Amino acid sequence: MTGSRTGRPPVQRAARRPVVSGPARENPLRILIVRARRAWDRPLTAYYLILGGSALITVLGLVMVYSASQITALQMSLPGSYFFRKQLLAAAIGGVLLLVASRMPVKLHRALAYPILAGAVVLMALVQVPGVGVSVNGNQNWIAVGGSFQIQPSEFGKLALVLWGADLLARKQDRRLLSQWKHMLVPLVPAAFMLLGLIMLGGDMGTAIILTAVLFGLLWLAGAPTRLFVGVLSIAALLGAILIRTSPNRMARLACLGATEPRTGPVDCWQAVHGIYALASGGIFGSGLGASVEKWGQLPEAHTDFIFAVTGEELGLAGTLSVLALFAALGYAGIRVAGRTEDPFVRYAAGGVTTWITAQAVINIGAVLGLLPIAGVPLPLFSYGGSALLPTMFAIGLLIAFAREDPAARMALAMRQPRFGKKRNGGSQRPRRWNTMRRRAPVARSSGER
């Protein structure tokens, strides 16, 4: 090694890294997508989506019920927060049901299937008893409990069909009987048609459509062939066409599809058209919470069936897209739980609950947008109505319990250690010492020290 002019050894410079340009450089968007996929594939993703999505939908629904129901309550000479307080009470009770259902073992879920089905059938039959059943908006599907409280037994019929149908199909799959048509159809389809008949006696076709969707979802999960689907669908379509043709009210709802004027000939399309008006006047970010104009007596059922229209008017396109995204996340999580489990009951029950909530949301939102006839079904977890909220929150608790039963999710939860209290494997745990990052005070030194 030769020395420099000053006699010092030359300093070796570090080799410069070649500048990477073009496609060799990592794309930040690609990194973000990879990280998002990793987060999406985590074992507890479905658990958090169900828990967080349902909580956000319920809370936002409470806010919109309070906003959309004030004028209706005042018109009925009631306090402005009347409907909100009833919905808040139902949400509190539903939260308890959700917590209980999420902590139940799967065996207990299966044990509850037959009692819930029997109770739903008895209550739905009592609706038709004079003096017991109550008619609301032309549909006799209610039972007066006491005071101003009423229950709609047909809402519990959805939960009954999901649990009982899932238990029935799981038992037959364990015995390898689902390859035969008669075991796939009987007694599932006759029991479902019995529930549909009890519902249609009260004139509630919207709930009947949801129940039919749940039935088709269970048959699809059971592996029903296409010919079987076509046969059952043909029977359901024929019965539906007869019921629509024989009802002037249902024919009028069909005539309101695509209507742009409140009065289309002899048909009154006031509700459908004013729902479109509410959505159109909201713009991107809405007129502001509580500033809806259509809820001032212009839009019927503003806090129940058409609460999505009030949401679009007050929160705009951003608010409605947020609601759609939450329901999409909830539906994806339910499909993921049903697809990853090895327990046939969990697969059928999770698929049935997901079909129930997703189909009801699509029918409600489609009716508000003018894409589907008005079916008179509430938006799940969002619209006013305790009878619809309680079984729906119990069903969400089922999904949470099923998401926790996933082997990977169970392992991820077991690896977590509690930060406070006792350890999982017994014994006591010392209190955690927090790192405060404080600097020590300088120690005073004598004048003789350096």
Question: What is the meaning of each model-derived region?
Answer:
Residues 51-67, 73-271, 309-367, 394, ...:
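Hydrophobic alpha-helical transmembrane segments of multi-pass inner membrane proteins, especially
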